[in-house]
């Protein structure tokens, strides 16, 4: 079995390197069809065919246990990526979760999806050589996962107001930090996300992950001013989320890539939908992987009986994941639970999250038999001492049998 996996990985690497031509090695662009992206590299904005993508995805085997870092688009598109690759080379990390469309609505790379081109999502791309960078990850044994933010997309909301949450007094509704949201009742919002995800898989990402698969979590008085134009009579927020995560799964399933969802950590504890449309049983019935965000700093005072949940990384994560496991078992769900763990300090909230607090969360998960996880730091800054060193093959005999 190990030999088969080694051969499959070698085939994936060979195919990726053989077919990689870079994003902009396809033809000559006429004058005036480029603009300066954020990194000051001239990037094509005209409608284009994704000729650097494959007609069919080339999928390799996923690691038996995924130990991943969240990598934001800026980090992926800059020299910081090489620092993170080196960190993975030297530690237990074997996967990166990369922002392909983040909560600004901007794309990681130029997209051929018509809606992305129409709304200007290609005007703020983060890298000009995504395919070459993906090839590098594959060469280093790093499993690439594409992350897509769905409902919090101010760029889409501004350019497609008919797809957006409206204010009862007119214009776009905005959250407490002034961000416009798209209407999670609207089918087109989710179809757009599915189109982008299919494109990413054909580019070389091995798995897709959807975040903000929900309605806004805002104070009641602000939500009372929100109007959702696409809501059907009698349709609840839960109905909309459940139908649309199924749509995402069905649109991606033919490509063979795992379909995964990030959800609130409290979803496994709640009896309702938290006012955002997320119910644990709905996700485990649809997803290949569910990723509850069990950050101790995000739990309310008194959660699980702790006055300061942020100061209890081991016990909060253990309680949260035990509830998730307990709710999944009666359903016989095959969905994997792969938690997001806190690798950041929230403001001035103490304690500061050092390698000790991070390892305590990992220990809590692993003691429950959950051996896959993702570390979240919004700046993609990680502490080496929070990670175990990479296990190396002990000798030629182990190498010849395929290694790990």
Model-derived features: positions:
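An active-site-proximal structural segment forming one wall of the substrate-binding cleft
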Residues: 80, 86-91, 136, 178-213, ...
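Active-site-adjacent "subsite" loops/lids of carbohydrate-active enzymes
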Residues: 57-72, 76, 135, 151-199
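Aromatic-lined carbohydrate-recognition surfaces of secreted/lumenal glycan-active proteins
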Residues: 70, 145-149, 153, 209, ...
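Aromatic-lined carbohydrate-binding/catalytic grooves of carbohydrate-active enzymes
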Residues: 91-127, 217-226
């Amino acid at each position: 079995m190990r030999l088969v996996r080694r051969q499959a990985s070698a085939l994936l690497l060979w195919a990726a390197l053989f077919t990689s031509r870079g994003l902009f090695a396809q033809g000559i662009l006429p004058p005036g069809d480029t603009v300066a992206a954020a990194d000051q590299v001239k990037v094509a904005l005209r409608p284009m065919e994704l000729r650097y993508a494959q007609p069919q995805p080339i999928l390799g085997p996923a690691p038996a246990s995924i130990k991943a870092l969240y990598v934001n688009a800026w980090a992926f598109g800059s020299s910081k990526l090489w620092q993170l690759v080196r960190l993975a080379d030297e530690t237990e990390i074997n996967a990166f979760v990369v922002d392909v469309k983040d909560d600004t609505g901007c794309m990681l790379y130029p997209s051929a999806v018509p809606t992305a081109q129409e709304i200007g999502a290609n005007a703020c791309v983060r890298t000009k050589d995504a395919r070459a960078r993906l090839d590098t990850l594959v060469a280093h044994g790093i499993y690439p996962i594409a992350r897509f933010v769905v409902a919090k997309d101010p760029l889409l909301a501004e350019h497609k107001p008919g797809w957006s949450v409206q204010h009862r007094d007119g214009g776009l509704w905005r959250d407490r930090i002034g961000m416009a949201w798209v209407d999670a009742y609207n089918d087109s919002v989710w179809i757009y996300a599915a189109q982008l995800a299919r494109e990413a898989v054909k580019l070389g990402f091995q798995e897709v992950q959807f975040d903000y698969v929900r309605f806004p979590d805002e104070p009641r008085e602000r939500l009372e001013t929100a109007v959702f134009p696409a809501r059907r009579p009698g349709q609840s927020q839960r109905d909309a989320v459940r139908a649309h995560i199924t749509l995402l799964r069905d649109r991606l399933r033919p490509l063979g890539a795992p379909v995964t969802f990030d959800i609130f950590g409290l979803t496994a504890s709640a009896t309702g939908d938290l006012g955002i449309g997320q119910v644990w049983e709905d996700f485990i019935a649809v997803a290949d992987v569910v990723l509850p965000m069990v950050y101790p700093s995000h739990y309310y005072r008194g959660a699980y009986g702790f006055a300061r949940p942020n100061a209890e990384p081991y016990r909060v994560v253990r309680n949260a994941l035990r509830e998730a496991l307990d709710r999944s078992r009666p359903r016989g769900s095959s969905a994997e639970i792969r938690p997001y763990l806190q690798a950041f300090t929230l403001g001035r909230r103490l304690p500061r999250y050092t390698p000790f607090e991070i390892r305590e969360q990992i220990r809590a998960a692993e003691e429950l038999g959950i051996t896959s996880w993702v570390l979240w730091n919004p700046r993609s800054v990680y502490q080496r001492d929070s990670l175990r060193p990479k296990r190396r093959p002990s000798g030629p005999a182990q190498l010849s049998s395929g290694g790990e």
